């Protein structure tokens, strides 16, 4: 699945 919003993936990686 491709992430349309960069913050989504970023928030997950930040956690």
Swiss-Prot record:
GO biological process: removal of superoxide radicals
UniProt GO MF annotations: manganese ion binding; superoxide dismutase activity
UniProtKB keywords: Iron, Manganese, Metal-binding, Oxidoreductase
Top EC class of this enzyme: oxidoreductase
Keyword match Metal-binding: yes
EC number: 1.15.1.1
Cofactor binding, note field: Binds 1 Mn(2+) or Fe(2+) ion per subunit.
Keyword Secreted: no
Catalytic reaction list: 2 superoxide + 2 H(+) = H2O2 + O2
Cofactor(s) it depends on: Mn(2+); Fe(2+)
Highest taxon, organism lineage: Bacteria
Transmembrane segments: none
Family classification: Belongs to the iron/manganese superoxide dismutase family.
Subunit structure: Homodimer.
General function of this protein: Destroys superoxide anion radicals which are normally produced within the cells and which are toxic to biological systems.
Stated name of the protein: Superoxide dismutase [Mn/Fe]
């Amino acid at each position: 699945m491709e992430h349309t919003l960069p913050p989504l993936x970023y928030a997950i990686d930040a956690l």
